[in-house]
């Protein structure tokens, strides 16, 4: 699920935050500059009369200085055009990188294409000549897998509802530890074995320790935004490789179709688990855990930086019921409105604060299942690049359409259904129609 977000915290921009990320959005005119000074007594009456005459002309900065909780529609369209294309590209790049890492690993490392085991969530084997029995086993595996996902999601919602934050943080930290240390060790070992690279165990352990420790700090505490994004991409790729290796072929395709339907229900249904998680977070005015979300802008949570004493005079927008449905982030985090500066006395040489950068958020589960689809196409598509490329393009087209619908409806949308549907259609049509057609043309030495 994804959406645009304005900010992730009700706090103003802090000194430590600006050291981690440079704001790229234009600065707004300060309130002091827009008001007449004490020495402009003769111009005060003229300024007030012009204010009455220019009621029809809407100045975006007037809202920021007066604290009026609203913006003209023209400014909203301008912001959509301004931030839309930029952040669509910023979302396409990590999705593409994650899928490239998975496909490159599948094509080069045989370990992830060898079938020597199954997950405990898919106990039914598909090693049977009967097509009906194989289809039945894949459906049963899918039911078990989706049931586990639903139960764990509801369990997470219950923990969050009863404020078991330490348990949730411990759960996420243990998962990150396993991915960044154990799975990275296995991955590096197989890569070194494939390319015949000699490596002693102390050096390997030291490299894995440094990699994992930096990742834990960046994901669960604080660090540069680019480094945090890189670690989230690596985690998604490692998890996708595990699914590709241990999910049976037919079960993988059925699970991909079922998980897209579940994503649709969980996000849009009023009693969906993710929607309930979002509503609880909005009631408490709290952010969702950043370890579950990829953000194209800084995900700023409480405790990551100290408050600047000079930023205590900010006024927040009042609660708006219509804004509640349109402020969900990619994994259920509320996107809080921007803070408006309260009018304060002007001081010479005072610089206006920079506006916080907007961004797009996408759940890590979307990264994982995008990569699973492309990786399965690369592993089971008889090594044909046309099938892999078709699935890759289909996912990007679906993601682009989802972002387009996001801009139209201005509400949170699930990111899996359109992309996964296009990917499945492109995979089976290319593998069963396009590839045989190309093979026939090549056998007759005909080129188009």
From Swiss-Prot:
The modification Phosphoserine is found at residues 22, 25, 30. It is a multi-pass membrane protein. GO terms for molecular function: aspartic endopeptidase activity, intramembrane cleaving; endopeptidase activity. Its EC number is 3.4.23.-. The active site is at 263, 366. The keyword Transmembrane helix applies. It is an enzyme of class 3 (hydrolase). Disulfide bonds: none annotated. Residues 19-33 have a biased composition (Polar residues). Homodimer. Component of the gamma-secretase complex, a complex composed of a presenilin homodimer (PSEN1 or PSEN2), nicastrin (NCSTN), APH1 (APH1A or APH1B) and PEN2. Such minimal complex is sufficient for secretase activity, although other components may exist. Interacts with DOCK3. Interacts with HERPUD1, FLNA and FLNB. This is Presenilin-2.
């Amino acid at each position: 699920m994804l959406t645009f977000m304005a900010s992730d915290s009700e706090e103003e921009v802090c000194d430590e935050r600006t050291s981690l990320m440079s704001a790229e959005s234009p600065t707004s005119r300060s309130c002091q500059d827009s008001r007449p000074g004490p020495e402009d007594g003769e111009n005060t009456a003229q300024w007030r009369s012009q204010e009455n005459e220019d009621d029809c002309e809407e100045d975006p900065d007037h809202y920021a200085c007066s604290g009026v909780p609203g913006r003209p529609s023209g400014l909203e369209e301008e912001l959509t055009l301004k931030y839309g294309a930029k952040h669509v590209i910023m979302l396409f790049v990590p999705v593409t990188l994650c899928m490239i890492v998975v496909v490159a690993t599948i094509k080069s490392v045989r370990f992830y294409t060898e079938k020597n085991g199954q997950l405990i969530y898919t106990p039914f084997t598909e090693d049977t000549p009967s097509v009906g029995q194989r289809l039945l086993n894949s459906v049963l595996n899918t039911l078990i897998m989706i049931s586990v996902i639903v139960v764990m999601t509801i369990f997470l919602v219950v923990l969050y509802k009863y404020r078991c934050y330490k348990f949730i943080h411990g759960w996420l930290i243990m998962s990150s530890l396993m991915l960044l240390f154990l799975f990275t060790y296995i991955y590096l070992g197989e890569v070194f074995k494939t390319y015949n690279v000699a490596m002693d165990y102390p050096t390997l352990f030291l490299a894995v320790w440094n990699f994992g420790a930096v990742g834990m700090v960046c994901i669960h505490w604080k660090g540069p935004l680019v480094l945090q994004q890189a670690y989230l991409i690596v985690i998604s790729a490692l998890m996708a490789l595990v699914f590709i290796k241990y999910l049976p072929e037919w079960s993988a395709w059925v699970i991909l179709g079922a998980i897209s339907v579940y994503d649709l229900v969980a996000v849009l249904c009023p009693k969906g688990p993710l929607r309930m998680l979002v509503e609880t977070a909005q009631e408490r005015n709290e952010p969702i855990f950043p370890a579950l979300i990829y953000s194209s802008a800084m995900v700023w949570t409480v405790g990551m930086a100290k408050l600047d004493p000079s930023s205590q005079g900010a006024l927040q927008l009042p609660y708006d019921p219509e804004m509640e449905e349109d402020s969900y982030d990619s994994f259920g985090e509320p996107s809080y409105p921007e803070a408006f500066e309260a009018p304060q006395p002007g001081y010479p040489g005072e610089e206006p604060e920079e506006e916080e950068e907007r961004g797009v958020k996408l759940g890590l589960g979307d990264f994982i299942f995008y990569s699973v689809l492309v990786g399965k196409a690369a592993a089971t598509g008889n090594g044909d690049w046309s099938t892999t490329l078709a699935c890759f393009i289909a996912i990007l087209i679906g993601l682009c359409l989802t972002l387009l619908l996001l801009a139209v409806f201005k509400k949170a949308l699930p990111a899996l259904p359109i992309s996964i549907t296009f990917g499945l259609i492109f995979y089976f049509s290319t593998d069963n129609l396009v590839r045989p057609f190309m093979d026939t043309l090549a056998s007759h030495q005909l080129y188009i």
